[in-house]
């Protein structure tokens, strides 16, 4: 209030502070609008702050004074972004091929204007939605957030849902031991998840592909033909599915039996029954347990969603390669669409490993293109101010003779 009076400000406004663990508060800034996090206040007060803002804009007084507010419980807000946490949180650009929001209730709220099929571009902030939850205390709110993130499914482009879920489960975060070094300290658990995947998930992904084939080639609607799924005269009653994950080929073999299949993968055998409930749900019985597994299926592959994490499997392609977003040894490519803000090298320049060659900016994030080794710049294809697309070759790079040797 004193800050607003000091500048003769009249109207709706919010003041931001940084608060230490001991309660010491430091002024940050004042905005002439609501904050992005205003739903947190709405959840614990039961007030509609957007209505308040409109009333104040019309010259009306605040509907309630501070002492009239009643604070109940604890609320948290997570911003679901199209970004790549494991790659420095760079924005992810593309079309959302599948989008499923958590079920909303008095304890779970989703604020978003994004729908399935929308394009995330370089021209706007890549936020997909705000997910706000309420609980009677911080522990209950964290549990609610974990459950809600587990129901939030996005496919078609990178996103931070899995990162947010790992953060919610992080002991430092759960105990509110928060500072700007948290992510760096917890890098191994937050940004470098294990590449290991359970046999059950591999077999489930393969079963989805197998059942999808059957759905695309249905048998006649005669009860006789429905008694043995996949039965073929004079052929082995088994089927092989191959998928790729993280550059490795995964091969699962299914043998039909009276009830479901026996799946063989990596030397293990598992009895499994499954049915596609709809385009995004697999009902299965695995290891004696019945469960439902959410998934998304595109021309490129299958993504499974389980407990806030997503697991992507690609269909087998003969031309599959493991080239990363930085390109090969001899070229460097744009990791995302954006504008070239600096070009720091020219043809024939000698550079050292990790030297910054140029910088690229998209959606308020600057990304540095660095030399992978000591070498020489053969060509630089763009100038400052040029717009580039993801995958555009930016620099042709040659290793020094001693590096090659």
Predicted regions: what they are:
Residues 18, 35, 39-269, 390-396, ...:
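Catalytic cores of soluble metabolic enzymes centered on carboxylation/carboxyl-transfer
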Residues 267-268, 305-306, 347, 355:
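C-terminal amphipathic alpha-helical interaction region
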Residues 4-11, 59-67, 291-292:
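Active-site phosphate-binding and catalytic loops of NTP-dependent enzymes
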Residues 322-405:
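Structured functional modules or segments
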């Amino acid at each position: 209030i004193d800050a607003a009076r000091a500048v003769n400000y009249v109207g709706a406004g919010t003041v931001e502070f940084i608060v230490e663990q001991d309660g010491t508060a430091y002024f940050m800034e004042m905005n002439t609008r609501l904050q992005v996090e205003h739903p947190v206040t709405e959840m614990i007060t039961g007030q509609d702050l957007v209505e308040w803002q409109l009333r104040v804009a019309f010259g009306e007084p605040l509907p309630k004074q501070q002492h009239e507010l009643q604070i109940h419980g604890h609320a948290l807000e997570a911003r679901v972004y199209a970004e790549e946490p494991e790659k420095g949180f760079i924005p992810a650009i593309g079309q959302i091929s599948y989008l499923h929001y958590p079920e909303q209730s008095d304890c779970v709220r989703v604020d978003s204007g994004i729908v399935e099929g929308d394009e995330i571009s370089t021209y706007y902030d890549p936020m997909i939605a705000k997910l706000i939850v309420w609980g009677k205390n911080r522990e209950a709110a964290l549990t609610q957030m974990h459950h809600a993130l587990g129901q939030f499914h996005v496919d078609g482009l990178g996103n931070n849902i899995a990162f947010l879920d790992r953060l919610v489960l992080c002991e430092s975060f759960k105990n509110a031991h928060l500072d700007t070094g948290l992510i760096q300290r917890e890098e191994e658990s937050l940004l470098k998840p294990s590449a290991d995947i359970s046999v059950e998930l591999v077999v489930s992904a393969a079963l989805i592909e197998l059942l999808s084939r059957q759905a695309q080639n249905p048998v006649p609607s005669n009860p006789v033909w429905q008694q043995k799924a996949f039965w073929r005269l004079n052929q082995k009653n088994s089927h092989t599915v191959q998928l790729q994950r993280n550059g490795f080929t995964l091969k699962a073999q299914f043998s039909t039996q009276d009830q479901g299949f026996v799946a063989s993968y990596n030397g293990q055998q598992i009895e499994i029954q499954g049915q596609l409930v709809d385009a995004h749900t697999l009902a299965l019985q695995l290891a004696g347990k019945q469960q439902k597994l959410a998934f998304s299926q595109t021309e490129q592959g299958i993504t499974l969603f389980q407990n806030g994490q997503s697991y992507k499997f690609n269909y087998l392609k003969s031309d599959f390669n493991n080239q990363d977003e930085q390109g090969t040894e001899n070229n460097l490519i744009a990791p995302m669409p954006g504008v070239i803000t600096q070009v720091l090298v020219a043809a024939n320049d000698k550079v050292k490993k990790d030297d910054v060659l140029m910088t690229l900016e998209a959606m308020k994030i600057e990304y540095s293109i660095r030399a992978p080794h000591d070498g020489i710049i053969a060509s630089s294809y763009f100038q400052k101010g040029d717009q580039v697309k993801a995958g555009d070759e930016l620099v042709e790079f040659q290793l020094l003779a001693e590096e090659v040797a």
